[in-house]
């Protein structure tokens, strides 16, 4: 849609990623405060979470670079790389998070206070993931890197792509809308203290991906 830089090396994709990260941090803070999780534990969750996010971004780039290398024989990583893949980032981020949570947590909390509020963390995590992911998908739409099949009109969107100019199914836009709806659903469940958020997220997003892909 508009992959060009707005100023310096900043484009709409990077702005959306930043908005997603900030939104996830705000949600984590506000929601855990509502559950009366101690400040020290919240800060620990935040630090480990931010580190996991950044490592997830790296692993998302790396996973896509490996896939691109297998497909084309060319390894591209970083600013001029092949892009990112969500599942590569999710797996890498989760691994780093658990290492930090159980490894570093044992050092910081002698009485395992961070584990005491683990259920609250797992309840809020899908809320943070969905809102951040939603902004990320909008960023993908602006970058023009992902789109569906060519169409004659609605529900397609007029786009300039490597496959030509015309109406293409804006899969990232519809996925962003779905993710924001899923964020609202998991938020309601969180505040009602119905801690089925991870199940709702995994099943809901899994079904959505199957629907949008096939």
Language-model features: where?
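Hydrophobic, membrane-interfacing alpha helices
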Residues: 1-214
């Amino acid at each position: 849609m508009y992959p060009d830089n707005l100023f310096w090396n900043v484009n709409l994709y990077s702005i959306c990623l930043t908005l997603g990260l900030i939104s996830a941090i705000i949600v984590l803070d506000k929601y855990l405060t509502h559950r009366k999780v101690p400040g020290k534990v919240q800060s620990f969750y935040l630090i480990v979470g931010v580190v996991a996010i950044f490592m997830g971004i790296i692993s998302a780039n790396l996973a896509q670079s490996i896939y691109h290398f297998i497909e084309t024989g060319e390894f591209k990583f970083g600013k001029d790389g092949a892009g990112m893949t969500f599942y590569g980032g999710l797996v890498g981020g989760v691994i780093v998070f658990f290492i930090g949570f159980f490894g570093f947590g044992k050092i910081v909390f002698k009485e395992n206070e961070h584990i005491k509020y683990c259920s609250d963390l797992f309840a809020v995590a899908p809320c943070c993931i969905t809102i951040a992911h939603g902004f990320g998908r909008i960023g993908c739409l602006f970058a023009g890197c992902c789109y569906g099949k060519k169409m004659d009109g609605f529900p397609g969107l007029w786009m300039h792509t490597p496959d030509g100019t015309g109406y293409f199914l804006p899969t990232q836009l519809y996925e962003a809308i779905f993710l924001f709806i899923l964020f609202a659903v998991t938020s309601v469940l969180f505040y009602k203290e119905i801690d089925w958020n991870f199940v709702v997220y995994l099943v809901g997003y899994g079904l959505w991906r199957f629907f949008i892909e096939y």
